[in-house]
Amino acid sequence: MSKAVLISIRPKWCEKIASSMKTIEVRKTRPKMNTPFKCYIYCTQGGVALGAWGKHGKVIGEFICDRIDWITHIGYTGIPNLVETRICDAATMRTSPVGGLLNAACLTPKMLNDYLAWGDGYGWHISDLRIYDETRELSEFTGLRNTRFGAEPYGIKRAPQSWCYVEVARDE
């Protein structure tokens, strides 16, 4: 059984991903998996450009997450003017500006800091994007719950708040 990730994304951002405008998805957490790994895109509602299927979401495509950047804040926390948001390389502890990441994520510095609430986050890099010709139902996927004995499969009944582990789809 191969492990992948099912990630919930709002229609506005799904449309930007589908049009290749958005190549990084920012999240507060990350999977405990080595890159690269497969991600299935669950669009939380039907967007006009994505087929407008109603109030319930669908899985619209998939991508490979080939890299994850650690987004952190350096400076005096609690004093926004003295804090700088940076990308940190966990191996070397060297930092770099977030400008390129913000552009690729279609975010402003304010949007990023509002979302992360001045905490750390992760930039999931999107590569090998594939948008499905026909959307898929959430029920077609099998979730994986971590237990002390390994991954336990379960039927997904509702979309994850942010993301969850799933089995790689059978038809692949």
Spans of features found by a protein language model:
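Structured alpha/beta reader/binder surfaces that contact nucleic acids or chromatin modification marks
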Residues: 2-172
